[in-house]
């Protein structure tokens, strides 16, 4: 590492903001499958022609567009991930990250005080915020392929019932149902979130097949009698005591021999690796009471709750998570 590394690190936000603005302005959908000049793009976008040319050139330099004979085209990457019509569209996640820009301005204060820069309400206070957050999670998992991969990989032999806690858009239950239609699947989540979940399930055409249960896992009892309880990206949003209590609740809700499956960033004992997890912990500092936890911490919560046969498995890239499983006696 040298000066260039530090220089790039300090200025990395510039590329992020260019991408955020391009998605906000709908540049990729506007260009679509045809080449477009700066003049035509500015006319369709209702933007300044000079400024439009500058951002189109920047997006080309960032390998998000191609430029030939003064016309701009989408490339394979932007066609797959930045067109709203693509099944792998990632734009929802980019919009959400853009909406967090002002939150990051509060980082120094958050470190001084130890308090989040944003009220940790899981984006439930404002309906638009709820939809932005939940659909961002849907776009992330769909674009990266997590749900499809796990639905194929997880051993569901002998499983008759599954509960997804904090499912958000329901992306994982949808994939599991399509792979294992004989399993009775339930989702337990906050009422504001379930309004968005219903839309996703209706779009997938399987709304009646998945049961939606409204509740707060920190305050309410969990429904009972499941062979598998799944929770993805939940523990990083909670503090140690809340996670320990949640494992106790999950143990009580499982059938004998049932399994808990946790998918999350799982850190090494130094809490510095993987890099994405250490950085994501700062995100959690800004917006929740949580952080990313080490395997030794998760293992202890599970053991204290009574789980046995605890295992972990790192998922392949581009997924950045680990699966931790435990079995009820």
Regions found by a protein language model. Give the residues of each.
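Conserved Class I S-adenosyl-L-methionine-dependent methyltransferase catalytic core
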Residues: 3-24, 29-30, 35, 44, ...
